[in-house]
Swiss-Prot record:
This is Trigger factor. Gene3D superfamilies: 3.10.50.40, Trigger factor ribosome-binding domain, Trigger factor, C-terminal domain. The lineage of its organism: Bacteria, Pseudomonadati, Thermodesulfobacteriota, Desulfuromonadia, Geobacterales. Residues 163-248 form the PPIase FKBP-type domain. Involved in protein export. Acts as a chaperone by maintaining the newly synthesized protein in an open conformation. Functions as a peptidyl-prolyl cis-trans isomerase. Keywords: Cell cycle, Cell division, Chaperone, Cytoplasm, Isomerase, Rotamase. Its EC number is 5.2.1.8. The gene is tig.
Length: 435
């Protein structure tokens, strides 16, 4: 067997194979014997079918099986011998398989880039300056009031306003023709929530229970359903019920409803404490992102599309999961799967490059994660999620991939700490961050 390797790029290799005719003939015989054991052809006993009859009835299967067996036997051996570590499935391109002739095929794969990280001393980055903001406490209290609010039917004759919940029937059409997803009964919508097509909710404001009206809107050009994007639509709407939100009064009794507080002042202090913690975490995460981007600017290299696609799919699923918790979809955001991927592909590529560089830095600086550090992190996870440590340990013991991911994250964190220790960090106001 002859093997040659072509480097199509820094992250793509093509492995060329030439299999001797004798090997092909041997594999054909093996496949023939295997098929003959099970072949059921009228007029012949199982296992006694002549070779020419087998070839006539099972020609395509024989060719497929021979190709599969040869590729499986030779491809993986070549990866080991040539020290190639693919991150993608191979794309196989082959000649026609002919008995008595050498067989040629190629396998093209993406590979992990060989990166030597450089210029990571003295990276210059900006960090957002933490600022205390009393308005946050007021806003959070308002959110808590909203969450504790209950809905009451509006008085007869009262017009709907922003913030009210309206239950209505609607039927949509484009040029008089109904379209999929354009109709519903007893649909409830909070006016001002932005869940509907731009302009739709605004036209419900001022309507009263029992009112019927025609609403005209234009679907956004980037709407998720491409067949509707940019088109004018008409909706007939009938208001069935209007409900208004009744907010609880902000006082000590309100605070006591949340269990651990005796006074409203205690609740405010806790809100401020949690906010400050979250703000600092956000600022540190932003600093981390800026540090990684600064490192990427110093280290130019290609990344396999397979890794970017994998990261994009992960981001998409996470976004869908978060939106689902709010009873939303990416289509409601004016996107579909392909639109999302196009919009966030650059961000996914940055994340992949960052992970590769941090891994390279960890190797170069001999950064390792100890068992004690893993145990400490598991304790933090248990505390943060109010879980029993024994259960957390058991989960990671039974999920090798989860534990490997945890160790990899800890190693990345230590690499970031090293970068920070060598970086020049300047604190600035938020508005100065991107100047």
């Amino acid at each position: 067997m002859q093997i040659s390797v072509e480097s199509l790029s820094s992250v793509k290799k093509k492995i060329n194979f030439e299999i001797p005719a004798a090997r092909v003939a041997s594999e054909v015989e093996k496949v023939y014997d295997e098929i003959r054991k099970h072949a059921a052809i009228k007029g012949f006993r199982k296992g006694k079918v002549p070779k020419d009859i087998i070839k006539k009835h099972y020609h395509e299967k024989m060719a497929d099986d021979v190709l599969k067996n040869i590729v499986n036997d030779t491809y993986f051996k070549a990866l080991t011998d040539e020290k190639i570590y693919p991150v993608s499935y191979p794309v196989i391109d082959s000649d026609e398989l002919k008995v008595g002739e050498n067989f040629k095929y190629s396998a093209t794969v993406e590979v992990f880039p060989d990166v030597e990280v450089k210029d990571y001393d003295g990276l210059e980055v900006k960090k957002e300056k933490f600022v205390l903001n009393d308005e946050v406490v007021t806003g959070r209290l308002r959110e808590m009031q909203e969450n504790m609010a209950h809905l009451e039917p509006a008085e007869a004759g009262v017009a709907a306003k922003s913030g009210d919940y309206v239950t209505f029937d609607f039927k949509g059409s484009i040029d008089g023709v109904p379209f999929d997803g354009g109709a519903a009964d007893d649909f409830q919508l909070e006016l001002g929530s932005g869940r509907f097509i731009p302009g739709f909710e605004d036209q419900l404001v001022g309507m009263k229970s029992g009112d019927e009206s025609e609403i005209k809107v234009t679907f956004p050009e980037n709407y998720g359903q491409k067949d509707l994007a940019g088109k004018d639509a008409s909706f007939t709407v009938k208001i069935k019920e209007i409900k208004v939100k009744e907010l609880p009064e902000l006082n000590d009794d309100f605070a006591k409803d949340f269990g651990e507080f005796e006074t409203l002042e205690d609740l405010k202090k806790k809100i401020a404490e949690v906010h400050n913690l979250q703000e600092n975490e956000r600022i540190e995460a932003d600093l981390r992102d800026r540090l990684i981007k600064a490192l990427i600017e110093k280290n130019s290299f290609e990344v396999p599309e397979t890794l970017v696609d994998k990261q994009l799919n992960l981001m998409l699923e996470n976004s869908k999961r978060r939106l689902a918790m709010q009873r939303l979809t990416i289509e409601m955001m004016g996107l579909n799967d392909e639109g999302y991927k196009a919009q966030f592909r650059s961000a996914a590529e940055t994340q992949v490059k960052g992970s590769i560089l941090l891994d390279a830095l960890a190797r170069k600086e001999s950064i390792e994660v100890t068992a004690a550090e893993v145990d400490e992190k598991l304790e933090q996870i248990a505390q943060q999620n109010n879980q029993d440590l024994e259960q957390v340990n058991k989960f990671y013991q039974q999920n090798a991939q989860a534990k490997e991911n945890l160790s990899a994250q800890l190693k990345e964190d230590k690499a970031i700490e090293l970068l920070l220790s060598k970086a020049t960090v300047t604190e600035v106001e938020r508005k100065e961050l991107d100047k």
